[in-house]
Amino acid sequence: MRKGRFLGCVMGMSFLLFTNAAWGVDLVGHRGARGLAPENTLPSFARALSLGVTVLELDTAITKDSVIVVSHDPILNPNITRDKYGKWLEKPGPAIHSLTFTELQQYDVGRLKPNTKYANSFPEQKALDGTRIPRLVDLFSLVKKSGNEQVRFFIELKVSPHKPEETLDPETYAKRVIDLIHKEGMAARASILSFDWRTLQVVQKIAPEISTIYLSIQQRAFDNIATEKPEGSLWTAGFQHKDHGSVPRMVKAAGGKIWSPYFGDLTEAQLKEAHDLGLQVGVWTVNEPGDSKKMLDVGVDGITTDRPDVLRQIMAERGMKLPVATPVQP
C-alpha cells in the first residue's frame, strides 16, 4: 500500500520491489483508483491503468465455493452495497465466505451510499450502477487485455486474529491465493501484503518467490503494533515491539524486506532506520497533495493513493519519470 520499489523477486531477481529503476518511486493505485471509480472493481482498475500506475493495490476475499474475489471487506459493506432489488444494505453482511460467487453477483457495488461520511470522502468518484465484485482472475485478464506487462499487483489478504470466523485460516487463505497467482503466471509481478503478519510468515515459507509486504498502523481506531499493551499484539506473528524496539526492526526480524506503514505514523527517523536495515518503505493511503509532496521529499520508496491522477501530476511537475499509461475498457 505504500511507496514503491517493488520489482519482484523470482529466481534470483532483485527484491527491489519499491525501487523500480525505471521511475524511482512506485505510484500505487489504491483499490484501483478509488477516488475516481467504485473501489476494487474492474472500472476502477481500468481507470488506474489508463492513467498509468506502477502498481495496482487490491484486497481479496474467498467465496463459499472457493472463488477468490476482489473486495476490501470480508463482509459486505453497506456504504457501497445494494441488493438485487436496488436497496441499500442496512447493516454489514452477509459474509462473503457464506455466499457462492453466483450469489455474490446479485449485489451492486457501483455507487457510494449518498449522504454518508464515506461518500463525502470521495466526491469525485463516478457512480457506475450495475458494477459487480470481480474475481481476481478477472483483474489479471483486464491487465493482459491492456497490454501492460510492467504493472505489478499488491494483493492484500484480509485476515484478522480477532475475527477468525470471517475468513479462512491464514495457511489455507494464503495457499489458495498463491496457487491462483502461479496459475495465471503472475508470481514475478505479485506481492502479498497483510496487517496479519502470520499470513506473511506462511507466504515466506511456502512461496518465497513471492514478495511480502508488512503493513502497520498505530492509530486509535486500529493499531496492529500495540506498543502500549504489555501482552503485545496478536497481529504480528509473535514479533513484539517490546522485544525489538521499533517497527522496522520487527519487520526485519520477521524476515521482511518491505515495510508499509500508514503515512501518518511514519517519521523521518523511522524511515532512515528502515533504509539502514535494508528495508524498502511504501506508505498508504496518501490523498492530499501536501502530504504526497512531503512523502516524496522525505524519500519514501512508494506511495499508495486513491487519486493516482493527482500524484502523477505532482510527479510530473517534479520531472519524475512516470509509469506508462495503457488505456483499457473494463
Where are these regions (language model features)?
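Phosphate-group recognition and catalysis centered on beta-loop-alpha active-site segments
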Residues: 20-330
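Positively charged n-region of N-terminal signal peptides that target proteins for export
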Residues: 1-5
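Bacterial N-terminal signal peptides
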Residues: 8-19
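General helical structural elements
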Residues: 6-9, 34-35
